[in-house]
């Protein structure tokens, strides 16, 4: 009963204190002066009234001087009396009676008549009038006594100092006494439950409240609890329409779990609410966003290690910034320069089309194997790759073909996002700037195809909506409120809860220490490299050795420079001819030709034709 009656007792005491604060000697003196002035004004008004009556009786002429003077004096006396009465009321308001005196007067108004009725009409009325009055008096006193009780909140010893303070303020007795101060009157909490993820309490709402309106008061609730500004607080609808649930994330169910390093099959992270491991299955197109310093690179490396570990898996890393790509060169195909990025995306598209033709009837995905492995394509950073594709092409000349169409980079990646899942070519797109504007790091066509969406700490709620959808704010996907570094949210379906996840931390040194694994390249046959038109079937650089054995070194695939030299040796004399023979884009051919010219392995004649130097002083015909 104490929490229920606490607001009444608090208001009673507040009014009593207000009245006592006004009962000062100055206000008492003003009241006495006002009472004296009012008594004098009443006496004057009574005298003026009697004089007017006498003048009216003495003369029948209403316009006589005596009657007019008496009438004017009476009117002035009455006006003065009214003014004195107004001043008296103001003085009484400034020096009010005590609340106890008012309570006695109020109860006397019903107790005295009730006692008289009971005494005079006992046989007819019975004892109920006086009994009812006594019950009202007893209820008033009991409400004050119970409402003023200070309930001691039992707090578990294992709670931290912050949790103990929050538990005390979430207790119904404290909440009911202070809710009115924060505009939360009509709400009352239930005893707090301590869970592995923090403190949880259910709030009962009266008819003035809806869960959505209560949620909108999150600032007032935080102030009432005295909670830290950076403490994660969740408010949502309860099990019934008149209830809401407050959750304070003072704890993490992932505390004490070691998430450093990586081993095959290890979870990507641990749910801080449930404590369950979070697995990200291979073969899922994925978006990973996180502002600078959020731990995006450290959190992503475990996924890349898993995607390059097995015999039927290969990894491609596209990193224009170079920093991440160089760590994976011993177990992934890396593309750093714009020419390399265009080459690898061209190869991936060709590989995709070839695989799609191999899918048998009745199946929707190609079966992966060491010969046809799943290829995970990791894009880091998305904004840089998009900027690459917007680079202005250099115009060609008669001798130099100019730059290739760099916009083909994004065309290839969009094609892979739309069509390559069935070919087991999986795109993982990472960016620090998850926006879709001109300088953003997400392409709308690619984003539309992604089903797994992860975000570490972001800058704004708008970025959270871009990553998780337009309902992110409504459903609680507030990645912009996550702490840094290494805490993420993962939305992999409509029923997934927005729980923070402590992700695995994998350092660059850990990546470099990983064992070598086969590197994927779309290899061509010697006839194709020499100028034949028919493409050779896909061959991997090497096979994966058994797990118990050290993997064998891969057979080195011919480089673009070697292919260009071989094509020139077979009779190709211009850059355009070499590009046609080798299937390499013209920009990469021009780059390789320049390297061969600088090394003296190829000569350019006056008419611009190319030839290979076979021996000292000799040129191939």
UniProtKB/Swiss-Prot annotation:
Transmembrane segments: 126-146, 564-584
Compartment annotation: Cell membrane
Alphabetized GO MF terms: ATP binding; DNA binding
Superkingdom of origin: Bacteria
Gene Ontology CC terms: plasma membrane
Gene3D superfamilies: P-loop containing nucleotide triphosphate hydrolases (3.40.50.300)
Keywords attached to this entry: ATP-binding, Cell membrane, Membrane, Nucleotide-binding, Plasmid, Transmembrane, Transmembrane helix
Domain FtsK: 275-465
Function, as annotated: Major protein required for plasmid transfer.
Name the record gives this protein: Protein Tra
Organism listed in the record: Streptomyces lividans
């Amino acid at each position: 009963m104490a929490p229920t009656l606490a607001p009444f007792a608090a208001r009673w005491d507040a009014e009593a204190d207000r009245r006592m604060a006004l009962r000062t000697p100055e206000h008492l003196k003003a009241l006495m002066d006002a009472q004296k002035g009012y008594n004098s004004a009443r006496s004057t008004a009574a005298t003026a009234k009697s004089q007017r009556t006498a003048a009216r009786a003495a003369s029948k002429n209403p316009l006589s001087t005596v009657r007019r003077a008496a009438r004017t004096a009476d009117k002035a006396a009455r006006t003065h009396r009214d003014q004195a009465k107004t001043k008296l009321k103001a003085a009484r308001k400034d020096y009010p009676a005590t609340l106890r005196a008012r309570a006695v007067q109020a109860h006397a108004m019903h107790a005295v008549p009730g006692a008289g009725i009971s005494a005079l009409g006992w046989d007819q009325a019975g004892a109920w009038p006086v009994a009812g009055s006594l019950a009202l008096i007893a209820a008033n006193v009991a409400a004050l006594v119970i409402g003023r009780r200070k309930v001691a909140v039992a707090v578990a010893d294992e709670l931290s100092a912050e949790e103990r303070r929050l538990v005390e303020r979430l207790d119904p007795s404290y909440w009911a006494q202070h809710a009115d101060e924060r505009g939360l009157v009509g709400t009352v909490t239930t005893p707090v439950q301590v869970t592995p993820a923090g403190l949880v309490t259910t709030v009962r709402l009266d008819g003035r409240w809806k869960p959505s309106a209560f949620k909108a008061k999150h600032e007032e609730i935080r102030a009432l609890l005295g909670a830290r500004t950076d403490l994660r607080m969740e408010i949502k609808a309860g099990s019934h329409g008149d209830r809401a649930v407050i959750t304070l994330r003072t704890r993490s169910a992932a505390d004490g779990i070691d998430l450093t390093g990586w081993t095959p099959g290890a979870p990507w992270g641990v749910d801080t609410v449930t404590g369950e491991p979070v697995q990200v299955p291979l073969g899922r197109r994925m978006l990973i966003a996180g502002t600078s310093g959020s731990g995006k690179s450290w959190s992503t490396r475990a996924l890349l290690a898993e995607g390059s570990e097995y015999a039927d898996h290969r990894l491609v890393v596209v990193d224009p910034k170079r920093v991440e790509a160089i760590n994976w060169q011993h177990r992934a195909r890396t593309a750093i320069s714009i020419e390399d990025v265009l080459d690898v995306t061209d190869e991936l598209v060709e590989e995709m089309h070839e695989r799609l033709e191999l899918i048998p009837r009745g199946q929707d995905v190609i079966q992966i194997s060491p010969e046809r492995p799943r290829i995970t394509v990791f894009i880091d950073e998305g904004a840089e790759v998009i900027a690459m594709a917007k680079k202005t092409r250099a115009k060609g000349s008669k001798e130099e073909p100019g730059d290739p169409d760099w916009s083909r980079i994004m065309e290839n990646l969009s094609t892979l996002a739309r069509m390559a899942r069935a070919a087991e070519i999986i795109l993982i797109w990472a960016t620090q700037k998850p926006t879709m504007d001109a300088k953003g790091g997400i392409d709308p066509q690619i984003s539309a195809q992604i089903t797994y969406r992860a975000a570490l700490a972001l800058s704004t709620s708008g970025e959270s909506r871009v990553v998780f959808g337009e309902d992110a704010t409504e459903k609680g996907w507030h990645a912009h409120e996550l702490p840094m570094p290494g805490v993420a949210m993962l939305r992999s379906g409509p029923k997934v809860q927005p729980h923070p996840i402590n992700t695995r931390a994998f350092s660059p040194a850990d990546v470099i220490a990983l064992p070598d694994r086969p590197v994927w390249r779309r290899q061509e046959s010697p006839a194709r490299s020499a100028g034949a038109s028919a493409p050779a079937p896909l061959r991997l650089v090497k096979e994966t050795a058994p797990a118990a054995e050290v993997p064998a070194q891969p057979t080195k695939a011919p480089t673009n420079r070697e292919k260009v030299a071989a094509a020139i040796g077979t009779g190709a004399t211009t850059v355009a001819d070499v590009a046609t023979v080798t299937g390499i884009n013209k920009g990469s051919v021009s780059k390789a030709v320049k390297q061969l010219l600088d090394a003296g392995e190829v000569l350019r004649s006056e008419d611009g034709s190319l030839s290979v130097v076979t021996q000292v002083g000799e040129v191939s015909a």
